[in-house]
Amino acid sequence: LTSSYGMKLKGDFKALETSIELYRKALRMLIPIINDGWNLISERRYVNQKYNLIEKWIHNTHTNQALFDFDEQFPKFPTYLRRSAIAKALGIVSSYRSNLENWEREGKGQAPKLSLTHFTYPAYYKGNLFRNFDPVNQTIELKVFKNGDWIYEVYQLKTSDCNYYQTHLI
């Protein structure tokens, strides 16, 4: 069971907005890569195999030379955000491909279009993109892109949000 709860923040919103925009730009880059490689991706049976294939296409390691310049476009992009963007882009393309297949079979209406722009947000999971939640001081540290690097930045929280978190989400 997964639960989510939105909290009001006070702090450097510019850094947070920049981080979200970078995530969305990564998504815009990944969608056509995944769509163009759909035949190879769809041959993979398990979703983790699909994620691994896409990650090999975009991420350099000691044993892998990426086919696309994702790492150059998004230097120091956190692993969790990269994998989150891959999962989101795979879902977008999968939905588009399913809709396209249905349209081709039924031939009704206009053909679906694959949009590259999505106003989505990354999930900030504990340990990956947030840490040090302090209900007493009403603060939390979020990973944001600031001054050319991904750092943890302290944000203030509302008392009611801290109380709700302690009561319902711990």
Language-model features: where?
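Nucleic-acid substrate recognition interfaces
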Residues: 1-170
